[in-house]
Amino acid sequence: RMADVNGFRQEFPAEYVNTVKNMIEFYANICFPDYSNPCFSDAKLGDRPAEIRNYQEWLKLFPDCDWIRYYATEGREGSPLPNLSHGALTSGFFTFRNGWKQDATVMVVKAGPKGEWHCQPDNGTFELWFNGRNLFPDSGSYVYAGDDEVMKLRNWFRRTSSHNTLTLDEKNLQTTQSVTKLWNPEGNEQILVTENPHYEGLKHRRSVFFVDQSYFVIVDEAVGDAKGTVNLNYHLCEGTVNVDDKSHILTTAYDGSSNMKLQCFAEKKASMREKEGWRSTAYRVRVPRTSVSFDVDKKDSEAVRYITIIYPSKNAASFPAFKAKFLNKKFDENGVKIEISVDGKKRQLEYKL
């Protein structure tokens, strides 16, 4: 912008200008329809008017860009990005999306390479927006740095178990170097398969299926010789959540028409545990929320495997009944095959690498 004002834009190569535009495009792809952004790592929750002003400034740089115009004018002019789901494979951010308006379903998954100080050890975590509400917001950062008491608070929000991912004995990840095994953003069974060497002796493979562009099936596999308690952690937004620890079911009862049902099916005996849950909405501001983990005692080298169905719905009064099971009887490096049932309608989901 300053180069334009001073008449020096031509001094910058086209590649540089394209890089700036690509950065804007990446940001648009990971944001939700209300212009808010995922609060991964040390990110702050964006302010809608400020974000719209940003797009208005960017439109001055790229006046012929239809999709920047769309976001700068709140959809009154231009057109949205031509894609729905989007993967940034180098940085490891993946978006499942069925639309650009308020009633859209949008999941953003963070599964990239090692980051530095501002990056939290949260590989495999996600946020999920549905019909105007972020149902699984990140814990955020709460505070940055200070004395021992301040760092205790910071470390609670940045720790791995405060995110929507898998841990062993609730310990922070030793390695944060996710590898994308498969990314298919098209069709009625969109798939992401990502793998991270969480700990010495234990890797985590997470496979996400976006089914019929309406609900999600997540397969988590903890593989290796390490022993301990495997925890599959989920953190919901604030509000009323009904917890059925016997059936491993969470159903939300939020005001409005954005709710969901989650049910976890563990291959081995598992216990569902409610635990302390918070999310930070601004610096030094936090609100309580429902947080749970599904715990499995891992005593040997056999993989610990889970299937989770997350079903967003506008109607909190009635959710479908779920069943799920693995069809491949043990962990397979080359793929997975499962069967799910939604209100009695069976369906097989699978991939091969």
Name each region found by the language model.
Residues 129, 142, 245:
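Catalytic-core segments of enzymes that bind and process phosphorylated/nucleotide-bearing substrates
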Residues 137-139, 145-147:
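Cytochrome P450 core scaffold surrounding the K-helix E-X-X-R motif
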Residues 1-136, 185, 299-305, 328-353:
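Carbohydrate-active enzyme catalytic cores, enriched for enzymes
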Residues 111, 139, 168:
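Active-site donor-binding loop signature of nucleotide-sugar glycosyltransferases
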Residues 42-44, 48, 52, 146-353:
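CBM-like, beta-strand-rich accessory domains located in the C-terminal region of large
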Residues 23, 141, 226:
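A generic "binding-loop/recognition-motif" signal
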Residues 33, 102, 115, 132-134, ...:
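Short loop/turn segments at secondary-structure transitions that flank enzyme active sites
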